[in-house]
């Protein structure tokens, strides 16, 4: 099936990253500490990616680059094949990562002083992205369900916050970080 991706890769190979300027490992207090606070995977990069990087490095010039048409074509094709969604390449905005994308969204959709609603606890970079764009944080606390061992949305509180006259944007983290929960279709 075209939607099934088979990847043969060894995820059991341990790789020590201490002493490599690893933000995750070299800032840990001791060898007996397992740093689980950052989404920094401890698996070696897939060989196809390192080969592509070597090919680029072998060129020996690192000037400004543009995003090639093949990138946009691949994104459009993937979304159509995987989700049945069709859109044009002009609908895609390339960013260098999640945090710059969050900041760009806030900048595009809000004005200074607007409120941005989050459901906390949530990915820490949401907070600095909101502040750095001159907006005010409005945090709707998630409810921890001790029976189901998961976070749940407090819809009454969320509705109240979203109804505020200065609320302009809801930053939804899905899957939720740090809870790991994928919000259900009914919740969304």
Model-inferred region functions:
Residues 62-188:
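Conserved core of the PLP fold type I
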Residues 8-97, 104:
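N-terminal small-domain helix-loop-helix segment of the aminotransferase-like
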């Amino acid at each position: 099936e075209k939607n099934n991706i088979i990847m043969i890769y060894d995820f059991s190979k341990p790789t020590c990253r201490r002493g490599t300027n690893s933000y995750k490992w070299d800032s840990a207090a001791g060898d007996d500490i397992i740093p689980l606070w950052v989404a920094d995977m401890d698996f070696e990069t897939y060989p196809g990616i390192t080969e592509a990087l070597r090919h680029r490095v072998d060129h020996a010039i690192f000037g400004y680059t543009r995003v090639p048409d093949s990138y946009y074509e691949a994104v459009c094709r993937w979304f159509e094949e995987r989700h049945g969604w069709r859109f044009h390449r002009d609908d895609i905005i390339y960013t260098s990562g999640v945090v710059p994308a969050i900041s760009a969204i806030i900048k595009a959709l809000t004005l200074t002083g607007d409120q941005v609603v989050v459901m906390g606890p949530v990915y820490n970079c949401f907070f600095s992205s909101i502040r750095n764009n001159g907006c005010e944080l409005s945090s709707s606390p998630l409810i921890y369900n001790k029976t189901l061992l998961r976070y749940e949305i407090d819809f009454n509180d969320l509705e109240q916050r979203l109804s505020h006259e200065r609320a302009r944007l809801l930053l939804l983290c899905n899957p939720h970080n740090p809870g790991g929960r994928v919000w259900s279709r009914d919740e969304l």
